[in-house]
Structures are given as structure tokens and as C-alpha cells.
Amino acid sequence: MTRIKAAVCHEFGKPLHVEDIDLRAPENDEIEVTLGAVAICHSDISFANGDWGGFLPAVYGHEAAGRVSAVGENVRGLEIGDHVVVTLIRACGHCSNCSGGAPNICETPVDGVEGPIKTVEGAPLMQAMACGAFAEKVVVAQSQVVKIPESVPFASASLLACGVITGVGAVVNAAELRPGQDVVVIGAGGVGLNAIQGARIAGARRIVAVDMSEEKLEIAKEFGATDGVLATGDTPWRDAKKAIGRGADAVFVTVGVSAVYDQAPRYLGYGGKVVMVGMPKSGESSTYEPVMMAAVSQGMIGSK
């Protein structure tokens, strides 16, 4: 065991405690990464607030970058000293989804309580989201890391680990956006801005950003949005349709607010789909009219 510092959550809604924990050495296809930077995702905040429950104590953090400092005996293609991004996407490589080209939704469960970290007393400690990156080091599966050039700063690289791949992935993988289609992105935060970038890369015709902040809408245009709509109005979906000239082919909800999911189908055109990215609190629900969506072949799909 190696003793390291980590920010540990002992009680939901309370400040994290920086304290010593024990980290075991990597085994089999695992890699130890000494972290150079870790970003704070809203998911980390939601977990720490208790929005989704879970085991405590826990170490959160899942957007990280650093140097490989040790490897398990079955690791191939990575060496000590390599610079890597660490993600929460852990893939077994042999379940139905992994075999079918969707490793981001691997079906093999990961027991974070039985992971590589313990309290200094030897008690269970949750490695949240298979990362536990609010720490000096992590031990993760090789499938969770991607080698990066040494020229990329760790602080910048850490943002690739969730915000970028979540936003761009929602557009490219979940929506399968085609050139010339029109999209609405609700929420111009980190994930929303990357959904906007993804839509631009995919060749979208009109990209409408919707947010409560004028400042964020201006930033969204720098990232590729063609139009900005304030969500503070009574019917922002009408403003979005006016900007596009029709309903959207895809609406990306990047905020974890149930009321926004209630409104999302209103932005759609015929055959459009709502892509669900933002995650509300556990136990919350949303409502929509199935008859309206069925009549014009609309749909809803989740995106991790």
C-alpha cells in the first residue's frame, strides 16, 4: 500500500476532508497514474451533495490527467512516464455492448467499494466513478486511460476526460448528427459548449444555444453557435424555431433540471430526437405527451 492524500467525502452536503488514504499497487491490466491536474465536474458536486446517493466515505473526481507511475503485469502499450488522460469510461472488452462497439456503456459492473483505495485504518472507501481522482494518485484499468502528447498541459488535458467527450459524444454517437441538420443545445456550460463544438464539427446548419445567461450565450457563439436564445422568456422554444426556421433535428439537454426535460420536446421538428445528457436528482421525474411525439416520429435517447 502507498499512502497518499485525497479529498474524502464523509457526509453528503458537507465539505470534503483532505486526509491520508491507502492506495494499493496496480494489478493485471491496471495502471497507477500520478495526477498533474483534475477538473471538477458538476457530477462530482451532485454526488457530494447526495443527489444520487451512494456509499460513504468516498473519493470523487473523474476528469484527470497525469503521468503513468506504475503498471500491472498485463498492461501493454503504456510505459512509466507516459502522459495520459484518465476517464470514468471503464470497458471490460467482452460484454455485449463492448463487443458491439459501445464500450461507454459496458455492462460489467464495477464495485468501487472493493477498489484499490482504503482508509488508513483499512476500512472500505468508495472509488467513485471508477476513478477517485480527487487524490494525488489513482489506480485504474488500462481501458480508462488515453496516452497524450507531453506538450499538452495537464490542466487542459483533464477537461478532455469528461466535458469534451460527453458533449461531442452526444452529438456524434448518440444523435448521429448529419451535415445540414439543425440542433438546439440547452445549457451553455462545459458540456453544452462541447456539444456545440461537436455539432459544428458534424456539419450542422443552425446551432441554437439556450441558456439563462447572456454572457454564456456570447461564449457559445465563440464555440460555434449560430444563434443564442435566453431561457428566461416564456416560450424560448418558439424563439429557437424562429432562428432555425423549423423545429430542430436534435435537442441536447446538458443541464440536470427536470423542468427543462419537460420543455425539451417543444423544440423538436418532425422526426427529431431529444438527447438526454444532463442528469437530474434521483427520484425526480419529467412529463411529456406521448401522442405528440408518436404522431410525428420524435424520440428521446440517453447519452453517457
Segments and roles (model prediction):
Residues 24-38, 48-99, 104, 149-151:
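Glycine-rich beta-strand-centered segment in the early N-terminal region that forms part
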Residues 239-249:
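A short acidic, Gly/Pro-enriched loop at the edge of an enzyme's catalytic core
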